[in-house]
Amino acid sequence: MKTAIITGASAGIGMELARVLAKAGHPLILVARSEEKLSALKNELEKKHRVSVDYLVKDLSEKNACQEIFDAVQLKKIEIDILINNAGFGDFSDFANADWEKLNQMIQLNITALTHLTKLFLPQMIAKRYGRIMNVASVAAFQPGPYMAVYFATKAYVLSFSEALSGELKETGVSISTLCPGPTESNFMEVSNMSESAFIKGKKFPSSLSVAEYGYKSMMQGKTVAIHGTGNYFLANLNRFVPRKWVVGITSKLMRKAT
């Protein structure tokens, strides 16, 4: 069975992806900052699904973390067949008043770490003519996002980067899928403070498990862009239905702080 490495595996969509892949029989390497959560998840998955689960405690916003992860995997002589770049976070704030350190950390995690891990693991996949890569973006990738300007921009990068790579990887045996969920019931809302936005407050959203199941199926089928949910598909294609200059206004109304 193909071995997978999953970043941001200690909560939300990442944790559910770990559960979905373990259920399918994949040996796993889990990456996140919390050893306590990773250890608990390892014990759960090994007991329930009888698969091999290892983990690495790393903060991917730190400069050398990606190389250290790659080196640790090489030292264990584990071949990675599936790379899931799930780690990321957002911040609900107008740009002028946002904390620069948090924004910089977001860029490092959402863009730099994802790109670096892909660069490190991709050559081996190409060499053996098999690999599956899932980069987790968002429906936010398809339009600018006032009050979460940097987050939306990082996800636009993930989508553009992944689609470009999919063009390079044709006939290599390696496929790259971009998972684009909308708002999801997870800890993302709390971490980003997004629960205060008009679009989110008081509403119910899909579970992390439903997103993870859809993402895994789409990745294994080699789907290039996987948008979860009919409503999210409409939002992702908003530019097709209305002039682009209107899109910022519509998104601004959706994203502003609820009154």
Regions found by a protein language model. Give the residues of each.
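Conserved NAD(P)H cofactor-binding loop of Rossmann-fold oxidoreductase domains
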Residues: 86-91
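Conserved glycine-rich cofactor-binding loop
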Residues: 10-12
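C-terminal helical subdomain
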Residues: 178, 199-236
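Active-site Tyr-X3-Lys motif and surrounding loop/helix of classical short-chain dehydrogenase/reductase
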Residues: 68-71, 93-97, 101-108
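Active-site helix of classical SDR
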Residues: 118, 154
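Conserved glycine-rich Rossmann-like NAD(P)H-binding loop of the short-chain dehydrogenase/reductase
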Residues: 24-40
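Residue(s) in the substrate-gating loop at a strand-loop-helix junction
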Residues: 138
